[in-house]
Amino acid sequence: MDIRIIPQKLRGAVTPPASKSMAHRAVLAMALAGGTGTLSNLSDSQDIQATKRCVAALKDPRPEGELPFLDCGESGSTLRFLIPIALAVAGGGVFTGHGRLMERPQQPYFDIFDEKGIFYGQTDGVLTVRGTLTPGVYRLPGNVSSQFVTGLLYALPLLPGDSTIEITTPLESGGYVDMTLDMLEKFGISVQNKNYAVFHISGNQVYQGRDITVEGDWSQAGFWYSANFLDNQVAIQGLNADSTQGDRVVASLYWKLAKPGDADVDVSGCPDLLPPLAVMAAVRSGTTRFVNAARLRIKESDRLATTAALLNALGGHAEEGPDSLTVRGVPAFSGGTVDGANDHRIVMAAAIAATRYSAPVTILGAEAIRKSYPSFWEDYKQLGGVFDVF
């Protein structure tokens, strides 16, 4: 699906969807609690559907010795959270996915599996993992996705003895780990956090069902913050100002970028915010450097490259480095065509940027928003956005 946007200012109120990051964690915790409790305000995004589908597959009866087949869609969280969980509850699993998912690195797990004697093999986009997680010490570098930490934090309490996770280098994505620890605590799981360097997890713990309402998504709210930066008037509702979501930092980064002059923004702890922040940077006075961004190259797209391409296609000035993006501000954009790159965040960033253009903007592959924000185009239209689908 391609969309042609006629530039218009956006005005009104919007409620971002439920937090995808929190929803993944809640769905998994509730499943490990035996399905007791209730879960409300759950996003219907493709990523959450993938986690629910895999949870159901883990519960399905199967012949003795047969591993569950887990289709993770395009969801990195689903895949990385469930690899250790499947080992803990089912002796492993056969994992598959779509898009670039199975190209995304799993080496931190593979290093652990080599040490622990757990089998793994990947052929033609299918990853098979078989073995038993045992209590003990698990080591992870801190400069990789926090999804690896979360997967272990969910699985290790189920083991018959105590375990420790050692973070061997400074942890970059502490906000996402905070979200995990908060959800585990809600479901009765105790973890001792020693300054994000060591996590002590007692074994033989039992997940306890809870009634959970998933709060609004600060990551998706980032696009509406970006809209306001571009002189739109959007009231953003339904967010928890005290949230453990790391992406709530978008509120303070908004004001940092509002100040004229050159600026550096470290996105190691909030990589998903890069596209909307880059749109803000493209129209501000000064040069903005987004640093510590190497992990963005292994998202749904090479997001450093596709964010730069988005801005440059529409008359901006962006240059990618190995782990950075440099954006020089321009007064306005000229319009053009953006390849959505099958990346939901690139599509939404382009739609927001279109409100500052002097000519129509075409976005190719606009349906990618279904991955995380299925109602994005409805919300965009309700706020006064004008577009044609072709």
Give the ranges of each region predicted by the language model:
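Short, structured segments at the rim of ligand-binding sites
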Residues: M1-F390
